[in-house]
Amino acid sequence: MKNTKIKIIITGGGSGGHVFVGLSIAEQLIKIGCEILWIGSSDRIESYLIPKSNIKIYKINVIGFNGNNIFLKLISLIKTAYSILKIKKLIKYYKPDIVLSIGGYVSFPGAIATWISKVPLIIHEQNSVPGLSNYILYKLTNCKILQAFPNTFPRAKVVGNPIRNAILKIKTPEKRFLGRFGPLRILVIGGSQGASILNLVIPDVAKYLPNKFHIWHQSGYSEYELVKSKYEKLFHHTEYKVFDFIKDISIAYEWADLIICRSGALTVSEISSIGIAALFVPYNHKDNHQYWNAKILEKIGAAEIINQKDFTKKKLIKLLSSWDRKKSLIMSQKSKNLSITNSAKKIIKEINNLIGLVK
């Protein structure tokens, strides 16, 4: 990149998936001397995670447009319009060289303000089905579109989802599984907010399959005490750990033989980059994007899917009773073979190409 300090705005957030992708890119950009300003929500995960990473954040107050409540939709439109005006003024003052939109409804005002201001805009779509914000931006603007998975947008470049460095350092499946014996190690992850269906069903399943598993279970903050008490009532020889939130997920990933989790875009990308057998329980979003994220690994035999309505104690006991480490290793190897490496570098290359074209 050029010797002068390049200013880049990253806009988006709302969920851990969006934020961790953006942070992975931001860290690489800072290393090569770029100045980063983040535009995010005032009351979501980015509002406290971004400052912890020593990145300046400009907070806006927006709400999503989904749902059937007409009044809330109207409020969403008003807040979005107001935020567009605020960000337009910010862009005029800050003078960014380029803006990167990482998705989520909070990204929309920043991306629209960028387009109106005629500043170069790149959109990164993390899911296999585009979110509403990115779909509108794709139709409305002439911005550069990058995608994590093939066929989300026609003719868009596939770059994957950037993965945190600690996760990229995890050993290959062959090295992890070498000499591993004893009960199957199951990691249960419900996302940063937890997942009630996993918290409800899995402790009961463990009770019916004693001695077969060791379980690490991330419950989320709100149901931590409930899940912990469920496991405490199990047989004393059942090994388990319950976490409200696993701070260093790379340790948990390296430990696991099998992961049972939702199928958000970043989770699927992390699982593939490491190579872990997965049992996905997609969240029932309106556009069903988590199901289609999971389908990418399920199609190659690297994962299995149970829809939430079918995720019962009986079905899970039947599935897990015959699951062994050999099956996990084969699935892990298939998953690893699909991984996309150097995603952050690919995105930075596209940023550099676009700035070079317009300067």
Swiss-Prot record:
Catalytic activity reported: di-trans,octa-cis-undecaprenyl diphospho-N-acetyl-alpha-D-muramoyl-L-alanyl-D-glutamyl-meso-2,6-diaminopimeloyl-D-alanyl-D-alanine + UDP-N-acetyl-alpha-D-glucosamine = di-trans,octa-cis-undecaprenyl diphospho-[N-acetyl-alpha-D-glucosaminyl-(1->4)]-N-acetyl-alpha-D-muramoyl-L-alanyl-D-glutamyl-meso-2,6-diaminopimeloyl-D-alanyl-D-alanine + UDP + H(+)
GO CC terms: plasma membrane
Main location, first listed in the record: membrane
Binding residue positions for UDP-N-acetyl-alpha-D-glucosamine: 15-17, 127, 164, 192, 246, 265-270, 290
Any one of the GO BP annotations: cell division
Enzyme class, spelled out: transferase
Keyword Translocase attached: no
UniProt keyword annotations, A-Z: Cell cycle, Cell division, Cell membrane, Cell shape, Cell wall biogenesis/degradation, Glycosyltransferase, Membrane, Peptidoglycan synthesis, Transferase
Entry membrane topology: Peripheral membrane protein
Pathway(s) the chain acts in: Cell wall biogenesis; peptidoglycan biosynthesis
Gene3D superfamilies: Glycogen Phosphorylase B
InterPro entries on file: GlcNAc_MurG, Glyco_trans_28_C, GlycoTrans_28_N
Places the protein is found: Cell membrane
GO molecular function, one term: UDP-N-acetyl-D-glucosamine:N-acetylmuramoyl-L-alanyl-D-glutamyl-meso-2,6-diaminopimelyl-D-alanyl-D-alanine-diphosphoundecaprenol 4-beta-N-acetylglucosaminlytransferase activity
EC number from the UniProt entry: 2.4.1.227
NCBIfam families (UniProt xref): murG
The protein's role, per its UniProt record: Cell wall formation. Catalyzes the transfer of a GlcNAc subunit on undecaprenyl-pyrophosphoryl-MurNAc-pentapeptide (lipid intermediate I) to form undecaprenyl-pyrophosphoryl-MurNAc-(pentapeptide)GlcNAc (lipid intermediate II).
Family: Belongs to the glycosyltransferase 28 family. MurG subfamily.
Protein name: UDP-N-acetylglucosamine--N-acetylmuramyl-(pentapeptide) pyrophosphoryl-undecaprenol N-acetylglucosamine transferase
Organism name: Wigglesworthia glossinidia brevipalpis
